[in-house]
Curated annotation (Swiss-Prot):
EC number of this enzyme: 2.1.1.199
Keywords of the record: Cytoplasm, Methyltransferase, rRNA processing, S-adenosyl-L-methionine, Transferase
Similarity comment: Belongs to the methyltransferase superfamily. RsmH family.
Taxonomic source organism: Nitratidesulfovibrio vulgaris (strain ATCC 29579 / DSM 644 / CCUG 34227 / NCIMB 8303 / VKM B-1760 / Hildenborough)
Database matches in InterPro entries: RsmH, SAM-dep_MeTrfase_MraW_recog, SAM-dependent_MTases_sf
Residues annotated for S-adenosyl-L-methionine binding in this entry: A44, G45, H46, D64, Y91, D112, Q119
The protein, known as: Ribosomal RNA small subunit methyltransferase H
GO BP annotation list: rRNA base methylation
GO cellular component terms listed in the entry, alphabetical order: cytoplasm
Gene it is expressed from: rsmH
Keyword Transferase: yes
Length: 323
């Protein structure tokens, strides 16, 4: 659990704009005296708003695998020091934190999946091709896997499959081949090196008509592979329902179609009643719905929010309530 340092200054987090903030508060519906889990604390924009909305007596367990994010979040949450319990953990490891606190259940849980604005904006973290930095992409700098190892050590077939699966990149084969050919003349060490290789792998007519930089999907794919982002989500969803109190709410914000698909299918599965085969004339399984889905379709940012925060453009929120 982290301490609350007093040498942190507000500018490190004051400009942070949490995505879909009003929608999170609406669907999480925090109440006084409740216990809440923020599995992806980031710079604590959502967490601080939850605590402000709920008032005294509310407690929040916050997790982040990135120690720098946790350091900054700790400063932002200093006014709520008696109400917060912060851990350097992956969100899939949330049960370790709840068990440490002696919390059998929580009244609400939030995860905001994907890379944070802070991580993108710090070139030395190696997430972005907008500024040069080491080819890293680890959300936890102490983790073993890195983008450098994938790019410089994996076979063509492995790179192709990663870029195709996680990036849904139609040029995955060409890009993987270009990476392997380039590293034959020396290691690929920086983000701009990799971005240039990917850009050259694209046919000129594709580059001329593309809305985004040609490296966008490849960088996304490598980041998701390095941090096992889909595996994290699956493991979290496997465990969270049992740790929600009756009436407890789960709110998930995702930025990628693969993640949103996983969340949608899992919530629909939880909301099913009878699971008997269709040919059985009468229910014999006795299964009843475990959740009530609160969002029939994903909630997205309003035009007003998009004007303030363009990075919210791909955010999708889904929510469910345990019955």
């Amino acid at each position: 659990m982290s301490e609350h340092p007093e040498n942190m200054t507000a500018p490190e987090w004051a400009a942070h704009i949490p995505v879909l903030l009003e929608e999170v508060l609406e669907y999480l519906a925090p109440r006084k005296g409740g216990r809440y889990l923020d599995g992806t604390l980031g710079l604590a924009g959502h967490a601080s708003a939850v605590l402000e909305r709920a008032g005294e007596g509310t407690e929040l367990c916050g997790l982040d695998r990135d120690p720098e994010a946790l350091r900054r979040a700790t400063a932002r949450l200093a006014p709520f020091a008696g109400q917060t319990h912060l851990y350097h953990l992956r969100y899939s490891e949330f049960e370790e934190a709840l068990d440490d606190l002696g919390w059998p259940t929580v009244d609400g849980a939030l995860i905001d999946i994907g890379v944070s604005s802070m991580q993108i904006d710090l070139a030395e973290r190696g997430f972005s091709f907008h500024a040069d930095g080491p080819l890293d992409m680890r959300m936890d700098p102490d983790a073993h896997e890195s983008a450098w190892r994938l790019v410089n050590r994996e076979r063509h077939e492995v790179l192709r499959d990663i870029i195709a699966r996680y990036g849904e990149e139609p040029m995955a084969g060409r890009i993987a081949r270009a990476i392997v050919d380039a590293r034959n003349t020396g290691s690929i060490d920086t983000t701009l090196q990799l971005a240039a290789i990917v850009e050259r792998a694209y046919p000129a007519k594709w580059r001329a008509t593309a809305r985004n930089h040609p490296a966008t999907r490849t960088f996304q794919a490598l980041r998701m592979a390095v941090n096992d982002e889909l595996g994290e989500l699956e493991r979290f969803l496997d465990a969270i329902l049992a740790r929600l109190a009756p009436g407890g709410r789960l709110v998930v914000i995702s930025f990628h179609s693969l993640e949103d698909r996983i969340v949608k299918h899992r919530m629909r599965h939880w909301a099913e009643g009878c699971r008997c085969p269709r040919h059985v004339p009468r229910c014999v399984c006795g299964h009843s719905p475990e959740v009530r889905i609160l969002t029939k379709r994903p909630v997205t940012a309003t035009d007003g929010e998009l004007a303030r925060n363009p990075r919210a453009s791909s955010a999708k929120l889904r929510a469910a309530e345990k019955v």
